[in-house]
Amino acid sequence: MALARAAGCILSFDPNLRPPLWDDLEQARDQIHWGLAQCDVAKISDDELLFLTGETDFDAGAAKLIAQFPNLQIVNVTAGAQGSISYYQGLRVFQPGVTLGGVIETTGAGDTFCACVLNFLLEHGLEHLTADDLTQMLRFANAAAYLVTTRRGAIRSMPEPEQVLALL
């Protein structure tokens, strides 16, 4: 992580918490805290936000994370079909999820969301993002994540950019 930071890389973290895989949830919390302390960009699900902060209110939970981990430049909170919220330098941008039906399974949706966010940030950078930029980022990421849920299998279900744009 130190080498990546020194090289100017954007560091991202998605805890992808799976409680049954941990013998001790406090150890999971400690490891997630370590990851959050290392990264610039965090993707946190609604359930993970509750686990980490005790907050059901997304704004309050994100504020706690940003206060606790000042290195975080962007916190993206995802809530499945309900949509996602991006918190960046005092901005709060909500983008509704895509709810066209046809969901088969949700495997890979969060990973797809993350990949789209990271692609956007690699193209646009982390500095001077606007609310419109964040809206564009979330809109594309939500649409791509939705498309993954309409297909079986995480890897082969990843949509091409043109497929996402056609949905939008």
For the regions a language model picked out, list residue spans one by one.
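Conserved phosphate-binding/catalytic region of the ribokinase-like
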Residues: 2-3, 55-168
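Conserved beta-alpha-beta core of the PfkB/ribokinase-like small-molecule kinase fold
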Residues: 1-63, 82
